[in-house]
Amino acid sequence: MEKLKQNPIVKKLGLNRILLVCNLVLMFVDFKVVLGSKFPVGDSIKSTLNYVYFLGFLSLGVTFVIATGGIDFSIGPVMFCCALISGYCMTSYHVPCAAAMVICVLIGFAFGMFNGWMVSYMSVPPFIISMASMNIAKGIASVFTKTQSVSWPLGSDPVNGWFRNLVSYKGFPVGLVIFLAVAVVCGIILYNTKPGRYILCLGSNSEAVRLSGVNTKKWRMLAYVICGILVGIGAIFFVGAYTTVQPGYGDQYNNEAIAGCVMGGTSMVGGLASIGGTVIGVFIISLLQQGIMAFGLGKGQQMIITGLIVIVAVYVDVSARRRKN
């Protein structure tokens, strides 16, 4: 094992990431062997990618928040709120699709600003404010849409159907390219810029950063703003893949996004984050969901399995930190 760790390729890519990719491949093979025709390769890959498109943006966003030592349980309902309100504006007020997409991102930005302000400047615990935002997002979406589901245009729509090309164009996974490009940008921000380094330092030792003269409130708030923007983008890709959105939903994606993030190597106590690991973790969670559905398990069983994954990932993280210390 020590020789493997010293391998230049392994050191460059990271042993944990390589193991995650191996787990992803083995999981896919296992599902195919066990399920057979119930798990068709082409359809399974397409369904997994549709899940990755939106869940990936949620996981990337919450990676920034967790890196500061915070948490955000509102990302799923906020994503639905973004999609519902912007879609309602398009269907009821004939707002152009491009403008509706901008509204999506702006709503996510507003929630990110609100959460960041309350955590950073009002000293409200992240858990409390994120739970409050979750209910606020559900309430606003229900009131605005009169508790009605909202459907975005189909690809056949001659005026607004073009936005679906962001997900897939003639079978080519455009959404995957966009997601990976955004992940690269997130990695550059987190590892190669001053704001990113401050965000990571906040999770490691917030008090030491404050005593060194850094405005910790500003940088903590920035992490939540980035998260909100990415959630807004995720809403666009959700409706691009699934069309219809219903008020009152979205909670189930909180744990899945956090599970992908933590499974990828981001520490729940902050200070350590892996964008590359998050990307792989999202693929694993998305593939797992497709496998669970192919087995015929219900939503309740899916939530139980996702919750157990979070527990195991956090336990592994805590154990690793104890060994280091």
Residue ranges and their predicted role:
Residues 1-29, 204, 211-218, 292-325:
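Cytosolic-side transmembrane-helix boundaries in multi-pass membrane proteins
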Residues 94-134, 280-281:
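Alpha-helical transmembrane segments within multi-pass membrane transporters and channels
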Residues 17-22, 48, 55-56, 77-81, ...:
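Hydrophobic alpha-helical transmembrane segments
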Residues 96, 100-101, 110-115, 119, ...:
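Helix-loop-helix "hairpin" substructures at the membrane interface of multi-pass membrane proteins
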Residues 231, 241-307:
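Transmembrane alpha-helical segments in multi-pass inner-membrane proteins
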Residues 25-37, 41-93, 118-123, 240, ...:
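Single transmembrane alpha-helix segments in multi-pass membrane proteins
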Residues 126-192, 219-222, 241-250, 301:
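Transmembrane helix-bundle core of multi-pass membrane transporters
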Residues 19-32, 62, 135-139, 178-188, ...:
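Hydrophobic core segments of alpha-helical transmembrane domains in multi-pass membrane transport
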